[in-house]
Amino acid sequence: MYQGKKVVVVLPAYRAALTLEQTYKEIPFDLVDDVVLVDDKSPDNTVQVARDLGIRHIVMHKKNTGYGGNQKSCYDKAKELNADIVVMLHPDYQYTPKLLASMITLI
């Protein structure tokens, strides 16, 4: 929660099994209320890693919809969770989730 606003991090995932744990563990949970992972029919064990990490909101596509389709599913689920602030974080560790605190406080 940030200034009374519900913060949801969305993770559009594809083949993220090897990087998801590192990404997830750096999320600033003092500001983030929920995490959503949308798996775009990954051929690896991304979903199992997400479950093992305790991610509660996992959406699994039955077919690969591409990056745009994955983003849409992320935002749809965040809306369903009544998010006030949605931050998209790539679970392949392109950048550190430690930057989220700076991003959220700018909103």
Protein language model regions, located:
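Cell-envelope/extracellular polymer assembly enzymes that use nucleotide-activated donors
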Residues: 6-8
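A conserved acidic beta->alpha catalytic loop
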Residues: 39-47
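Acidic metal-phosphate-binding loop of nucleotide-sugar-dependent transferases
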Residues: 65, 93-94
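Conserved donor nucleotide-binding strand/loop of the catalytic core
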Residues: 33, 47-81
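Conserved donor-nucleotide/metal-binding helix-loop-beta segment in metal-dependent transferases, i.e.
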Residues: 98-107
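Donor nucleotide-sugar binding loop of glycosyltransferases
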Residues: 16-19, 42, 96
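Short beta-strand-to-loop acidic/aromatic patch adjacent to the donor-nucleotide binding site
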Residues: 83-92
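Short, well-formed alpha-helical segments that are part of the catalytic scaffolds
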Residues: 14-29
